[in-house]
């Protein structure tokens, strides 16, 4: 159904339905190098591991063909990063916590005198409901027009606690009193000020529970051309304007972290457009039982609105290059294999701990069992190999000593049942 115009060339009239279930397993890891973590003159690396799994991702596709017309529809998860959990938090939160402690503690606390406990869970799903019509103009050409309604649901849950180690509070209090008395305060005034500082440290906790929703409409057009054994196709999806609105149930933070937490405040709207997409494809029937295809996708990310206009920092939109082969072993079995290379045009300013991408290539294999002329079963598996992305000078401490390395893995298994009524 990536070539909806081609549905008009289905050999038989009637209804066809495909029910698909996919299982996806991903990791999203960050290796953060910084002198902040210890403040002892050494650069250390903290590793933050994110895990995401979606055991059941359902989708349904259907088409009804009558004469030169074909009417199609689908419901599926068409985007979003799924659900990911970082049990040890994220580098951006630890760096913010250390900065907060330095501000409140007036630089008199080192990281070995306190502990930071944090965790973050994020989720992003885009559900798509698509309807359209295909029309066969003649024996060579068919066209398609339709639209997809996209509904976004997501959010973040997380916490961050700062705890002074045993005896540190008393030591800090004595240091603050000594410093303030040297500045001219009386003992009583200095003790009162030190008590306030200690209370500020005890209150230096972050907590977030925020849901996000939004929707947008994607108009779609397509064309399909058949010339003997050669099939050419093109599809264009227009940009969907979408704003994500916060429904924040809990947001707890000290005043010093107000700017840091501002994007998660209740009612805040953030642009999150779905980019326009162009798809071009060609397939050729080498033998009656053997077919090969190549395909190209372009996502116009640089012109899709994002938070703080970060899309402008991309070097270019996303390019995807695909190739595949399909072989009918006999009337009962069909096998296939495919390859995809993805280039996002990434930049340091585009990448962040809560949203990062890595260039990649994917390899997949599949098979079909034709139980009857009407009933068939598809199975497929693919994995993605990502190129690590290194972002330098993340916390403004110098490129050579301050960097984050983003890495990912992805494995997906799918099963589909197809029936022709």
Language-model regions, residue ranges each:
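Outer-membrane beta-barrel porins/channels
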Residues: 12, 57-58, 63-421
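N-terminal, post-signal peptide beta-strand-biased segments of exported outer-membrane/organellar beta-barrel
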Residues: 1-80, 356, 382
């Amino acid at each position: 159904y990536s070539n909806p115009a081609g549905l008009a060339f289905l050999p038989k009239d009637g209804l066809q339905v495909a029910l698909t279930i996919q299982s996806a397993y991903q990791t999203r890891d960050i290796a953060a190098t910084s002198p902040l973590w210890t403040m002892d003159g050494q650069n250390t690396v903290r590793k933050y591991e994110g895990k995401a799994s979606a055991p059941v991702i359902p989708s349904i596709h259907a088409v009804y063909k009558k004469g030169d017309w074909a009417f199609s529809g689908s419901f599926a998860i068409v985007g979003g990063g799924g659900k990911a959990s970082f049990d040890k938090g994220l580098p951006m939160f630890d760096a913010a916590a250390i900065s907060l402690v330095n501000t409140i503690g007036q630089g008199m606390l080192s990281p070995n005198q306190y502990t930071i406990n944090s965790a973050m869970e994020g989720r992003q799903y885009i559900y798509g409901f698509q309807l359209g019509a295909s029309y066969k103009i003649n024996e060579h050409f068919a066209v398609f027009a339709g639209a997809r309604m996209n509904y976004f649901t997501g959010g973040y849950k997380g916490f961050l606690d700062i705890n002074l180690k045993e005896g540190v509070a008393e030591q800090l209090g004595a240091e603050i009193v000594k410093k303030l008395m040297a500045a001219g305060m009386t003992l009583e005034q200095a003790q009162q000020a030190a008590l306030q500082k200690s209370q500020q440290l005890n209150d230096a906790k972050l907590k977030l529970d925020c849901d996000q929703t939004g929707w947008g409409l994607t108009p779609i057009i397509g064309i399909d051309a058949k010339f003997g054994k050669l099939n050419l196709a093109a599809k264009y999806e227009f940009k969907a304007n979408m704003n994500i609105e916060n429904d924040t149930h809990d947001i707890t933070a000290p005043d010093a972290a107000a700017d840091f937490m501002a994007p998660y405040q209740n009612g805040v709207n953030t642009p999150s457009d779905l980019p326009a997409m162009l798809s071009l494809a060609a397939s050729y029937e080498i033998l009656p039982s053997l077919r090969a295809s190549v395909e190209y996708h372009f996502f116009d990310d640089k012109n899709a609105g994002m938070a703080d206009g970060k899309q402008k920092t991309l070097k270019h939109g996303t390019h995807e290059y695909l190739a595949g082969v399909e072989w009918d072993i006999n009337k009962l079995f069909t096998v296939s294999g495919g390859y995809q290379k993805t280039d996002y045009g990434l930049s340091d300013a585009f990448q962040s701990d809560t949203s990062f991408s890595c260039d990649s290539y994917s390899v997949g294999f599949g098979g079909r069992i034709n139980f009857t002329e009407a009933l068939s079963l598809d199975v497929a598996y693919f994995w993605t190999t990502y190129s690590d992305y290194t972002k330098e000078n993340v916390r403004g401490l110098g490129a050579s000593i301050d960097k984050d390395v983003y890495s990912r893995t992805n494995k997906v298994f799918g099963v589909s049942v197809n029936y022709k009524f």
